[in-house]
Amino acid sequence: MTQPLNRAAIVAAARRIADRDGLAELTLRRIAGELGTGAASLYRHIADRQELLLLLVEDLVAGYPLLDPAGVAPVEAVVRQWHAMYDHLVAHAWSGPVIADGDYALPSAKPVADHCMALLRGAGLDDAAAQRVYRAAWRLIIGHLMSRHPFGHLQGAPPQQDDFDWALRTLLRGALAE
């Protein structure tokens, strides 16, 4: 083992495995193998797989990009922020089902919610509409993450990333028109 064994090293190894192979392949034995240690030594730092998943989701939340809206039209700032979050989650394909399960509503995600809500209000939505768009945009992201079918029978269809952009902008236009 080239690095000291600690929670950060364990979470980094877990993220590499989950990103590469998916959550189904994320076992303490695999993490230990990647770190060059025995599985039992991991238990000095984490209690069990459930705690490992919690730490992995905390790590995911810590990586959410919060874009500065300065110099950008308010609606475009909202679109850019949600695209950045979408791109972050696409890089961690395992995140869709974990977020959708709803088991990890973490206090550390509050700054992300606050930032997104401020952008939505800045785009002209009242609190109630901003909350609805916030929830709908999350469901939109999760739906795109969990439904990665290429829909190849739609010849000439735009790329799926374009579908996300279209749906997000349509959601915002509809909410702003109310």
Please annotate each region the language model reported:
Residues 150-178:
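C-terminal peripheral helix-coil segments that are non-catalytic and often amphipathic
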Residues 45-46, 133:
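Residues in the recognition helix of alpha-helical DNA-binding motifs
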Residues 1-37, 47-54:
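Basic, helix-initiating cap at the start of DNA-binding domains
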Residues 58-63:
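Short, basic, alpha-helical segments at the C-terminal edge of helix-turn-helix-like DNA-binding modules
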Residues 38, 126:
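Helix-turn-helix DNA-binding motif, specifically the short coil turn and the N-cap/start of the second
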Residues 65-108, 127, 134-137:
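Hydrophobic alpha-helical connector segments
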